[in-house]
């Protein structure tokens, strides 16, 4: 593929890396700060603090915390989309409930009434509860109770139980802004809490809801990587792991009109 890219004149990440020659040494060490308008500031033996007074530990801590916030926002927004999708699911719609038993199990975990109710009514209420996990004003993430009790105790004692997902991201963003947190311990503390919001709130919602909507995965043989490409077929490659889009591409590929169109242009 790299040879083909070179022949076709397609620039790859390796080409761009080569063009960089030497990357910024301060950036590689993480002791360069460009968060506020007074900077950028870089730490050296002669200038051990930035203009705001932050030393290298605080600068690295702020940069790391913002990376955590960015990653949490990305994965959790994926979960938000899946929750929205389940809120719109319907029996005759494009998105339906594939794993009803997993939905019922989750509903009971969250104290959502299931007896005598239509499965889609249950799904919509569970979706609403999940969406509240992003901005609820009180309490901690619901999925924390699924962790081992010993681990829950550690999180509670350390004070890193995540609250609402969006709140943890916002806390990092404002705390790392100009004139705010300059204590490395506090920065690491909020980074840990936000990481747990990612893993035990956003990611858990995305995973459980994907199983409910699209079916719980089972072990099976399949093709991967370059093995999926065929000359005599229409090849559609999706970048990312958003199943709500992938499922609709699969649905569209089975549309008789589109299948006929593909055959007209030479596909098997």
Residue ranges and their predicted role:
Residues 1-268:
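Metallocofactor- and cofactor-centric catalytic cores in central/energy metabolism, strongly enriched
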């Amino acid at each position: 593929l790299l040879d083909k890219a070179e022949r076709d004149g397609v620039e790859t990440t390796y080409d761009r890396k080569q063009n960089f020659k030497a990357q910024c040494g301060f950036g590689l060490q993480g002791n360069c700060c460009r968060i506020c308008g007074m900077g950028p500031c870089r730490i050296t033996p002669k200038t051990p603090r930035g203009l705001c007074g932050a030393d290298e530990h605080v600068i690295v801590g702020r940069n790391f915390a913002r990376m955590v916030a960015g990653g949490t926002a990305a994965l959790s927004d994926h979960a938000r989309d899946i929750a929205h999708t389940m809120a719109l699911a319907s029996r005759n719609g494009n998105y339906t409930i594939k794993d009803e038993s997993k939905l019922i199990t989750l509903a009971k975990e969250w104290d959502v009434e299931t007896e005598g109710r239509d499965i889609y009514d249950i799904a919509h209420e569970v979706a609403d509860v999940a969406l509240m996990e992003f901005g609820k004003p009180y309490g901690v993430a619901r999925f924390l109770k699924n962790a081992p009790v010993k681990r829950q105790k550690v999180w509670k004692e350390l004070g890193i139980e995540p609250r609402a997902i969006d709140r943890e991201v916002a806390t990092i963003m404002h705390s790392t802004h100009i004139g705010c947190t300059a204590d490395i311990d506090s920065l690491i503390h909020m980074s840990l809490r936000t990481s747990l919001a990612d893993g035990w709130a956003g990611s858990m919602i995305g995973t459980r809801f994907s199983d409910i909507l699209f079916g719980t995965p089972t072990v099976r043989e399949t093709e991967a990587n370059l093995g999926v490409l065929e000359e005599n077929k229409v090849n559609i490659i999706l970048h990312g792991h958003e199943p709500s889009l992938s499922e609709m591409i699969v649905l569209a590929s089975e549309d008789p009109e589109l299948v006929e169109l593909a055959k007209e242009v030479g596909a098997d």
